[in-house]
Amino acid sequence: MSKRQSFYQFLMTERNPDSTDEIAQFANNAFYDQSFPKQADDYDSLSQYLELNGTYLPSMVIFDNAWTKYEEFMS
């Protein structure tokens, strides 16, 4: 069985510097966040990190939408 992909690894597949899509912009900004928890794959730790440090994320709804896509991708 393969190892579960981290949320960050998934999020990097959504990067697109030319896109105005909110998830793409989140991914672009997370790429430059050197403290982003790159190995995390659980909602609570990522949510807590972003609430405290994700000044580049205008709304936690964007994270929630990205998390839903991540869960769909992982299932």
Curated annotation (Swiss-Prot):
Origin: domain of life: Bacteria
SUPFAM superfamilies: YozE-like (SSF140652)
Signal sequence bounds: none
Protein name: UPF0346 protein LSL_0716
Similarity annotation: Belongs to the UPF0346 family.
Coiled coil segments of this chain: none
